[in-house]
Swiss-Prot record:
SUPFAM superfamilies: Ribosomal protein L36. Keywords: Ribonucleoprotein, Ribosomal protein. It comes from Leptospira borgpetersenii serovar Hardjo-bovis (strain JB197). PANTHER family: 50S RIBOSOMAL PROTEIN L36, CHLOROPLASTIC (PTHR42888), LARGE RIBOSOMAL SUBUNIT PROTEIN BL36C (PTHR42888:SF1). One of its GO terms (cellular component) is ribonucleoprotein complex. The gene is rpmJ. GO terms for molecular function: structural constituent of ribosome. One of its GO terms (biological process) is translation. Belongs to the bacterial ribosomal protein bL36 family. NCBIfam families: rpmJ_bact. This is Large ribosomal subunit protein bL36. Transmembrane segments: none annotated.
C-alpha cells in the first residue's frame, strides 16, 4: 500500500474508488494499491 498525496491509475486494471471519504486505488496487481494521505 502506497500512501501519497496524489493517487493515479498506474495500469488499465486500476480502479479509483472512494471508501469512507478516503480515495483509494484498487488493482489486481498488489503493488498498485494506493491510498490518499
Amino acid at each position: 500500500m502506497k500512501v501519497r498525496t496524489s493517487v493515479k491509475k498506474i495500469c488499465s486494471s486500476c480502479k479509483v474508488i472512494r471508501r469512507k471519504g478516503v480515495i483509494r486505488v484498487i488493482c489486481t496487481n498488489p503493488k498498485h494499491k494506493q491510498r490518499q494521505a
